[in-house]
Amino acid sequence: MKLTLVRNAWLVCGTLVWLAGNSSRATSLDLTTTTTSGFINGAFYIRTDAQATGSGAINSFVRVGDNADVVEGYNASARPAMPQVNNSGTFTHDVLLNSVPTVNLSGTNYYEFLLDINQASSAPLLSLDKLQIYTRGTALSSAATLADLTAGPSILRYNLDSGSDSEILLNYSLNSGSGSGDMIAYIPASLFGAGSDFVYLYSQFGGKGGAYVNNAGYEEWAYRSASVVPEPGVLSFAALGALAVLARRRK
């Protein structure tokens, strides 16, 4: 099933947010409206209205969830996993970088990661507060703590908070529920090494507090089984130069 990134390509271009500028200030990227997107530290984030993609169409590689305001974790086949990570090998496991599809946007290659969130319908907001992507030449043998990932030969390839304490604001009510993607993260392929490396994605949700805490279900990262071709005109980076700067900066 083809993944539709947004309902209207023109609206996306008209509301595209350019956040790649001042890295010394914290960025709050608000994806709580229907056609919002933006850059943080070179990565492009876009809210997606993807519907359930069907068995085999996407590959879940980490589920994070708990009865707590803030949840965190990363993918690995090693057990035990971090306390808030789903232990099923179906949903939480090692991933080779060359399994993750790439997308070419205006001549630049990006790795594509799909995020599906779950919140109560009465309180649908959620913050993504940390996103760190690491690679290793060999698989992790222990994954019980974050230190198991960050220590040793792991290489940090992308950090949402590099140079600033940034966040992405999400809205569960904009999609049809669990199984519908909520956001796509495009991470520059130039940041990574060999495709034979193992890739590990750590994320934290709910840290903003207030209306943005975790309150239901799980958060899931996945990748699609095949290379992705965006719909014509949807992600035209050539339009960036004509856009106003719409970034909202946290003081």
What are these regions (language model features)?
Residues 138, 239-242:
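Residues that form or immediately flank small-molecule/cofactor binding pockets and catalytic motifs
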Residues 17-23, 245:
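Hydrophobic membrane-targeting alpha-helices
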Residues 246-251:
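C-terminal membrane-anchoring or membrane-association module
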Residues 27-228:
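Surface-exposed extracytoplasmic segments
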Residues 3-5, 9-10, 14, 23-28, ...:
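Short, threonine-centered small-residue motifs that mark membrane-proximal processing/anchoring sites
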